[in-house]
Structures are given as structure tokens and as C-alpha cells.
Amino acid sequence: MSTVWRRIIASLGLKSRSPEADLLEPDELARWYAGLDLKQRLAVSRNLASRVRAPRATRDPATLPAVARGRLVFEQDGPRGPIALHHLKVELWDRDFGTPDDFLGEGFTDADGAFAIRYDPADAGEGDLPDLELRFFEPQHTFRKDGRVVETWRRIGSERGPDDHGGLQYDFGTVRVPYWEYDPASPLARLLVVEEGTPPTAYAPGRSLAMLKAVAPIELIKRQHQLQGRLGQAPSLAKIQADYPESTTARMERESPGSTRSDAYFGERLLNGMFSSVMDRDPEAPGDAQAFRLYLPWNAYEQDGRHCLPDVDVRLRLVEGRLLPVRIILGMREPGATAPGSPVTRRTFTPADGADWEAAKRMARVSATLDVELGNHLGQCHFNVEQYAIAAHRNLRRNPLRWLLMPHLREVVLINHSANGFLVGSTGYITRSSALTERGINKRLEHLMGSYDWKGFAPATPVCEGHRYAKAGQLFWRLLGEHIDAFFAEHGTELEAQWHEVRRFSDDLVTHSVPAFVCRYLRAKVPGKEAPWFVRSERMDLDAKAVEPPPKAVSAVTHTDSPQPGEVEALKNLCRYVIFFATFRHAWANNLQWEDAGEVLYSCLGLRWGKGGALSTEEDLDVAPEPDEATEMLWISWMLSKTNYGFILSNEEEDVHPRLLELLRAHAAEFAALGLDVRTVSSRINI
């Protein structure tokens, strides 16, 4: 009697006449085994390992009388028709109601997605004709401590065949599988998730607990503030700030008033804070190695007219090892102006302007905060890495490249799916709290994604001795190079043997990336010119991309099914780039949120037009965020900085090669001296 029937009978208060013991379910056995201590697990393993790991008895497929055929393709067609789902594991089963299903055979799809599984109908059981079902599986892996790979298979779908099939031939035909599909409605390379649907992956269990632990202390605070607002009793910004844990800048101001608003601190955070970005030389001071420029062109995008977001042009200078702002030029629209390219009035501020200089610095700081959230954080890390994650999941199965990349690509599509409505979109936090409209945000992200390419990327060199971010980035980049070189030395032969998967991976990347974007200013100043002020190492090759019609932003690794000269090195560079942004770069932008965006009056995503304009003091609350936006900002900054799960050195899922862990541990003291606790760097983007 089946377990199901025995339990139904028991639930009705009846007793089974059968004396046989209740059948243990696999999950029951797994829970029991997980509860044993190490000594007990070793004892059980000694007794069962030979049977658990024993391969199924193999039979010569040619001797099996029946065959099931078919072809697996992606749900969505490509330009030339159906796209093959290559190298997926497929299993053929006999469905049985109330008793365990019977395994009939297995195989793999070929390069065209076709499969043929030979089987014996008698394996369905005596007197039973098989009820055919096809099941598909994707590969998973873990690493043992010695670097050996352990492969497992995760079921991703199934296709029902006929009941009581008595023939010796069955063709499942072309089976369309909705697997890691691109969203045809998005100009970016984004994963398609239907309304009320879920992505084809899941968070590791520990991540949910870490999220709850981080957010629980502040969730009630935010909800209380929001309820007070709905009741018409919104708390003051000072009360909102005081209700949250003390932020870094608030503590510094308490201990040393004015310290975080100083020119020196402004420059230091541009070098080493979450605002850290590429520092170009000042093009108006050719040959001056001490002069720098940061330019943020916001007038190119649609704005809501309620917030003030001018073009920001900051000129900086190294003075005795410190980067100091010396001039800020703001291209101010008129209040209420919304159209891209609206007329602007340019105003210049210097330290001699007193309160106006402080207001200009605040505007520049807010602008840099929005830029890092849309650029360094959401664009260059989250959405940029997502396009590599989709292409990798669609194409890498037999190639060992999967073992190198997948640990750093897992979960990014999940957190990005949450961002679709939480941060961006018509009701997203960035849309509500900044000057950019939904269209403005989308266009900015499209332009940003059009400027990202793996080819030729290397972290920029430090501009001064105190440029800790750049030094840490270069050290991390070097260690990734050592890790990847060793991986290719170990697996290079098989990697090249499965190069056709690399070609398909590369094809998907290029096909679905946005067109390269080069703004009018750079198009006029850089391509074909020396332009020594322009930092090229972290930018795409403008000479190659500033042509008409514009090529795709992401460069191809290969165009053939076997590697050509230089292409293996190109693939190494791509891997290094992806892992760098999924780990170090994201950690730096994300983990410093509470440090640099934990005080509403210090920095936020948008200042409003007030009665006296937008360039006023912090005491003028007309320009500051509204209470509901303020509490949400602090909640988000805390959540991003304090959700701790998925660190490289913890390696909870054991999917990162132990070599990378060893390299980072060996250089932990060097990172610490640069202000980075390497234990806080995640292996992937999951927050």
C-alpha cells in the first residue's frame, strides 16, 4: 500500500490492515540526517556511502527496445527562429499515482536541443504501461576544500507525454521551455518575469533570515512614521533622524561640528566614500596633474519640476595630499521646467561665497548621491551584472566556465526584480524622491548601460596617497587575475573543447546589450584625439564605439566555435570584469550607504524648489525631503548596509573555489589598511 493511501486512511481514523512500516519520505530522511552530529554522520556515511553513490546499473542503450525523442527550445524565438536549449539533462519517467514514479532513462540535449532516450517499457512495472513524462535538469555545483567539483542536478521543468503508452516510439516534438527569457519590453538586457510570476531561481535560505535580522529593528520605526503621516501628524525631520540608529555623519557632527560639511570631507568622500568614481583631469588645466573634474549632466533628462537637479560641474584640486573642491558650476533650470534640454542659467560658486558655497556643495553632494545610486550601484553593478547572468544561465552547462562565474551571478536577477517597483518604475523610491521622472530614469539607465563594456577595463590608478578606494580596487583586481589565471590553467583544455557554449554566451551578450552611448561632449573631445585628461581605463573604447550606426555596448569575446588567437585572454578579462563588479565594486557602493546616506540633511536623492529657490541652508526645510521620503531613505540605507549574507569568505553555499578565499584571506591585512574589511565583500549581488 502506498504511503499516500496509508496517510489518508490514518487521517480518517482508520487502521491499515497492512503490517508494513510507514514509508519514509526523502525530506524526512534529509531532516533526520541534518540533525545528527558530525560523529553520527560519519558513522552513517561509512555504512551507506557505497550504496548511495553507487551508479545505476548500466545497460547498453542499443539493447533497449523503445525510444523517446524530441527537441527542447527556448520559449521565445530568435531572429532566425527557435533557439536550441543545448546540453540540458533530460530524464524519462513513468508517472504512477500513489506510488513512486519509475525511472526509465536519461540523456542530454545536443547542440540543436535534440534528444533521444532509449528505455525498456517493462521498467514501468509488471502489468503497467508507462505514462510518459519528460523532466529537465540544470547543473549545479559545489567545491570541496581541495578544489574538486561536485556536480548535482536541479529539476527545472517537465513535459507530460501519453498515458499507457504501448508503442516503442514516441516523439515529444518541439518542447518550448520558458527558461531565462529576455524581457522583450525592456531596452536593457533584463530577465522576463511575468506578472505575479517568479524568476527561475531562488535566494539561499540564509539570506531571508539575514534580511529579517537587519530590517526588524527599524521596520516598526518606518511604519510608525508613515502612519503618523497618514493621520496628518507627520514627525519632523529631526525626530525621524533621531528615531533611527545614529549615522556616521551625525556622530561625526556631534563629536566635531562642521566636520562632515567641510571642503576636505567633501573631497575625501568623492575619493573613498560610496560616491567613489572616476576622477578625470580638468580639461581646462592641461598638464596640471593636481587639477580634477567631476561632471554630472542632469539637464539631458526629463525632470518632475518639483525637485531641483542642475547640471553639476565640480572642479577639484590636490592640496597637500587632500582633494579639495575649488569651483562648482551649476546649470540651473527654472522651477517647474520638465523637458530634457531645458534652458539653464549657469552659476559659479567658490569657497569665497560663504553660505552660497555650502549650498552649492550640498547640491553637488545630493547630485553625486543620485548618480552613484543610478550609476555605480544600480546600473554598473546590478543591471550590468544581470545581463551577464542571463547569458550565462542560458548557455553555460558543460563548459567549466560555469564553475568560475555562476557563484557570482546567482541571485542578482532576484534583487533586480524587486528593484523594478521598489526603486524604479512609476512608484519607485528613486522616482518619488528625486527630480528624475520615470522616463528620465529609464533614459539615464539606458545611457549608462550603453557606456559599460568589459573590453579594456581596468581599475583607475590612485590620484593621491590617500585614495584608498583605488588602491583597494587595484589589489582586488590583481588577486582576481591570479585566481582566474589559475582556473584557466587547470580547466583550459575542457574550456576550449566546449567553446561553442562561450560563443553562444557571447552572442547573447552582444545581441541583447543596448547600443553604445557616447554623449556629444565626449564625442567631440575624445575619439581620435589624445585627450590626456580623460581616464580611459574604466571606460569603453570610445574610438571603437563612437561610430555610426552605434555598435552594441558589450563587445564580443568570439564569433566562432573554437577559440581564435587572443580570445582566451579576452574571456579571462570578461570573467575578471564580471566578478569585480559582482563583488568588490558592489560592496564598496552598497556597504557604505549608511555611512554616506544615513543623514537626511547631509545627503539625499533630491532637494526641492523652496520659497527662496533650492540653494539655501539646511535650516530651510522647504527644500529638504518630505517626512515620508526621509524615513524611507533612512530605512533603505540601513537595510542595504546591514543585510549580511553571502560573503565570499563565508562561502555558505560552497560554490566559490577555495583558491579565491585563500587569496583574499592572505591579503586581508592589506585590505584592512585601506579601510576594507574583506569579510564584508559578498560573493554576489543579493541586496
Predicted regions, residues:
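Feature of secretome-associated and extracellular-like proteins
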Residues: 2-83, 88, 99, 123-250
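Charged, amphipathic alpha-helical segments
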Residues: 55, 64-66, 114-123, 289-300
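Hydrophobic alpha-helical segments, especially N-terminal targeting/anchoring helices
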Residues: 66, 72-77, 93, 109, ...
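Structural signal for hydrophobic/aromatic residues that build the beta-strand cores
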Residues: 70, 90-92, 113-117, 134, ...
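Short, acidic Ser/Thr/Gly-rich low-complexity loop/linker segments typical of extracellular
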Residues: 98-118
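Long, compositionally biased charged/polar stretches
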Residues: 191-687
